[in-house]
Amino acid sequence: MKRNNFFWGSMVLVAGVLLLLKTLGLFTFNFWPVFWAIMLILAGVWFLLGPRLFKADMIEEQVTIPLEGASEADIRFNHGAGRILVNSGNLGGNLLNGTFTGGLEKEISRSGSSLSANLSMPQRVLGVAIPGVDFKGFAWNLTLNRDVPLRLHFSTGAGESVLDLSDTLVKELRVETGASATRVKLPMRAGQTRVTAKAGMASLEFSVPQGVSARIRLDTGMSSNKIDTNRFPLTGSVYQSPDFDTAANRVDIEIEAGMGGIDVR
């Protein structure tokens, strides 16, 4: 049985039982608040147990995306739940390769010398990888071409993202995440890199390689902020390396967050 069929079938079953009891006059109060409460409970149970009960449905798809002569690339990652692991390597004529548990939907386009890739979880997938539980969840494990200038956009939901971009040529990095943990090693040889992060109730950790300067601007609500002020002293409302304006390799970081933790080191 497919995960979606089981989940939505359970929802319809509960609604039908409540309507039957209402019709038989077994209760006279407004059952809709009860219905939505039960729906939330079922959804919670589903998120906790669904991936374990239906692991047989999970497939591992091996994907390679060729550069096709492109000299730079934009990649958007739409990863709703689970774990995403990113590193880099010598891939020759390929932009990336990797393993995508749960399948992958991709859209590839080319404009001049630039390649654009939009990578998403399949729409049929429903589930969440829970930290600390021993199952693969919806795991993406991929390698990026270390020698191609990149613009990356990560849109993630619940789960964990571990992004080792230290040996890449990432020029622009955007991270948008919800209730998750995100750890990023920033580029050490990309020249200037612009980083924009927006987070809800999330943990964000950015590691700036030694020899790379940084400027950090924060717009945070109730988050806990931890910035290495020995490397990035506070000047006014900005944390900045003393040599930021003249550094050959530098990262310009702007973070907007609600609740959670921000760590830049």
Model regions and ranges:
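Alpha-helical transmembrane segments and their membrane-interface anchoring/capping motifs
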Residues: 1-265
